[in-house]
């Protein structure tokens, strides 16, 4: 197994040896020397992306951001309209490792690095013997061939756009273990590719009615309204419906966002803080409810940031008849069998555990809602009561229908149970206690969460670790929402354990990147 990482100071000698092997002995670009080492003239400016097997350097790419680039020194005119491009100074793979798998892994590492560094364009002098291989990855020639004999090179440019259109991009696309956007079933993609329907036609109205009916069944509520937008829109719509004095339960980043929704809507409310990673302390909540009579309580069913699922039935039992329960169920719906019967408003979306494409916001409610001239039109829940209220996308509705057809709530629970047990058994520190663990997403507390997330992505597994609140808390999240399989999860766990061990060793050795 080849491990990919950014080179440290201890890798320098091996880099010089591989540079010599490739660009002196194999490609006669430089004169031989007794030491059989070649130090790149821009070595101190290079960032080296390397692959090692059993501690032996087998592949590398050197990235340089400083102008002028090598091609410019050779007289090639570069596009001056590009923002902060870079160049690949060296690209080398040992002959015995020149199979498509090694090169593809190296290229995936390159694309992860370029994205992290916000580099959209990179130049290379590609050897003519590998020009077809470069083209498969999206490199395009920009000038005539340079050099002579066995040392001929084609000036080429790779952009994120040409990479995404390349024949290899789908092969290298990582598996998503995200809470959104999620991996979708092939039938969902196929449904989304149908010809769009005008939003005022009878077929569109029927599609809208059918989908809202299925969502009523899923939520166990008599009414569901649908808007084109995100979960943020759904919660903004709900905030407009709140009146009187309320209580917001805040157990993390998304509880905090409910506070922001209510504050922006000018609502009156108190805040009840929940312990991070733990169930609701019912006695404390009951005490606050006893002290103040609230018109509504708003909480997240699944607090996505911590991976905690709150007990709605326990909260319901504490409320009197006049207190409305409002639920953000965006990361809960589709992860298990839940009834939201009796909840005044419930929000969810198409692009999370339901498994559809992002773009549909659902608001479930216990009773019909009339339009109000005091509410901005797009935030007026009453305008959505009869179905299609504004311009919408039939493709999103068709994709969501296909996602509901593919949704297996029992399998969702099995996958998450296996993942949680396996991760706990390997010694990782999970933020949520076992009794509070959500069935769709878990949060790992790790001192090198960002490095671990990068390592997983390089290996082809995209988990959540880049949001500001995750970086700030050193958290990494794995979600089983969407079309993940048990085989995918088993492979992810093996890679997770291996990369964690590698990072731990590197941290113990206090290794730092070469040329940081």
Language-model segment annotations:
Residues 212-215, 221-247, 251, 255-260:
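Conserved beta-loop-alpha segment that forms the PLP phosphate-binding cup at the N-terminus of a helix
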Residues 74-151:
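Acyl-donor binding region in acyl/amide transferases
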Residues 183-184, 351-426:
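Active-site C-terminal subdomain of aminotransferase-like
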Residues 279-330, 334:
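Active-site phosphate-binding strand-loop segment of PLP-dependent enzymes
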Residues 476-516:
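PLP-dependent enzyme catalytic core of the Aspartate aminotransferase-like
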Residues 42-46, 50-52, 56-98, 152-153:
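Conserved acyl-donor/pantetheine-binding loop and adjacent beta-alpha core of acyl/acetyltransferases
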Residues 429-459:
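Conserved PLP-binding catalytic core of the aspartate aminotransferase-like
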Residues 1-38, 43, 48-58:
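Short amphipathic alpha-helix that is part of the acyltransferase structural core
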């Amino acid at each position: 197994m080849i491990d990919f990482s950014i080179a440290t100071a201890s890798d320098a000698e091996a880099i010089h040896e591989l540079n010599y092997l490739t660009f002196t002995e194999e490609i006669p670009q430089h004169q031989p020397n007794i030491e059989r080492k070649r130090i790149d003239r821009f070595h101190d400016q290079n960032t080296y992306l390397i692959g090692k097997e059993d501690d032996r350097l087998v592949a590398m790419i050197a990235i340089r951001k400083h102008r002028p680039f090598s091609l410019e020194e050779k007289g090639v005119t570069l596009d001056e309209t590009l923002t902060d491009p870079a160049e690949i100074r060296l690209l080398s793979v040992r002959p015995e490792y020149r199979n498509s798998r090694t090169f593809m892994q190296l290229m995936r590492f390159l694309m992860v690095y370029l994205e992290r560094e916000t580099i959209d364009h990179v130049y290379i002098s590609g050897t003519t013997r590998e020009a077809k291989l470069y083209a498969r990855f999206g490199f395009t020639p920009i000038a005539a061939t340079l050099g002579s004999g066995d040392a001929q090179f084609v000036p080429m440019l790779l952009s994120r756009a040409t990479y995404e259109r390349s024949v290899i991009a789908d092969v290298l696309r990582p598996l998503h273990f995200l809470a959104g956007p999620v991996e979708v079933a092939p039938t969902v993609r196929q449904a989304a590719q149908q010809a769009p329907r005008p939003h005022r036609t009878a077929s569109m109205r029927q599609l809208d009615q059918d989908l809202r009916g299925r969502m009523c069944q899923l939520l166990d509520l008599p009414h569901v309204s649908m808007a084109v937008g995100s979960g943020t829109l759904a919660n903004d719509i709900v905030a407009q419906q709140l009146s009187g004095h309320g209580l917001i339960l805040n157990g993390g980043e998304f509880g905090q966002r409910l506070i922001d929704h209510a504050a922006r809507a000018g609502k009156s409310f108190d805040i009840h803080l929940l312990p991070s990673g733990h169930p609701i302390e019912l006695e404390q909540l009951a005490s606050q409810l006893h002290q103040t009579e609230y018109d509504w309580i708003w909480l997240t069913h699944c607090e996505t940031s911590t991976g905690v699922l709150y007990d709605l039935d326990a909260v319901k039992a504490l409320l009197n008849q006049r207190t409305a329960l409002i639920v953000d169920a965006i990361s809960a719906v589709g992860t298990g069998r839940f009834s939201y019967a009796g909840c005044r408003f419930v929000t969810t979306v198409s692009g999370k555990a339901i498994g559809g494409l992002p773009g549909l916001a659902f608001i479930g409610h216990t009773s019909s809602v009339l339009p109000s001239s005091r509410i901005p039109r797009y935030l007026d829940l009453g305008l959505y009561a009869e179905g299609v209220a504004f311009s919408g996308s039939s493709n999103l509705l068709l994709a969501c229908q296909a996602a509901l057809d593919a949704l297996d709530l029992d399998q969702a629970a099995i996958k998450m149970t296996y993942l949680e047990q396996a991760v706990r058994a390997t010694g990782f520190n999970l933020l949520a206690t076992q009794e509070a663990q959500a069935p769709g997403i878990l949060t790992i507390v790790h001192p090198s969460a960002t490095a671990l997330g990068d390592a997983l992505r390089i290996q082809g597994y995209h988990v959540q670790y880049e949001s500001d609140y995750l970086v700030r808390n050193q958290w990494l999240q794995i979600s089983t929402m969407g079309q993940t399989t048990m085989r995918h999860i088993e492979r992810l766990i093996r890679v997770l354990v291996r990369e964690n061990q590698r990072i731990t060793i590197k941290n113990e050795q206090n290794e730092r990147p070469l040329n940081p």
